């Protein structure tokens, strides 16, 4: 592996191979994702998630922070707030929510946990 490959991962979103999303339980084929730095064992890192029109996430709780940026489309959160392209949202550790989209959307997700102490 080249030095660049060890230090940087570039995702060409148009050519990325998205996989069915399964981080919140059962496979959700209407939601796909592409890991960038996500580590399943540590439950943190970044990824891009695509939700097809009509897709709904399962209700879930976060052990750490979940931040995301709407890249395309609109996403409605469980409290009814509509998030649009350019909106950035941050959920605190222990928070729970679910979301859905009528239009379809693409989001960049960043899950992280603060250092203990």
Task: Tell where the protein language model's regions lie, with residue ranges.
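A short, N-terminal "cap"/entry segment at the start of jelly-roll beta-barrel domains
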Residues: 1-42
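Conserved short histidine dyad/triad with adjacent acidic residue
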Residues: 30-62, 92-96
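Structural motif
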Residues: 44-48, 68, 105
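Glycine- and acidic-residue-biased ligand/ion/polar-headgroup-sensing regions
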Residues: 53, 62-78
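Short glycine/proline-enriched turns and hinge-like loops at secondary-structure junctions
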Residues: 61-63, 81-83, 101-103
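Short acidic-glycine-tyrosine-enriched beta hairpin
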Residues: 77-97
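Ligand-binding loop in jelly-roll beta-barrel domains
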Residues: 93-117
């Amino acid at each position: 592996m080249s030095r660049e490959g060890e230090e940087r991962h570039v995702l060409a979103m148009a050519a990325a191979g998205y996989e069915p999303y399964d981080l919140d339980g059962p496979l959700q084929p209407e939601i796909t994702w592409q890991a960038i730095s996500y580590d399943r064992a540590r439950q943190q890192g970044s990824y891009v998630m695509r939700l097809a029109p009509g897709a709904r996430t399962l209700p879930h709780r976060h052990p750490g922070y979940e931040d995301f940026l709407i890249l395309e489309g609109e996403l409605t959160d469980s409290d009814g707030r509509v998030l649009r392209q350019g909106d950035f949202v941050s959920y605190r550790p222990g928070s729970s929510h679910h979301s859905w989209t009528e239009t379809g959307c693409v989001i960049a997700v960043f899950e992280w946990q603060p250092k203990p102490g």
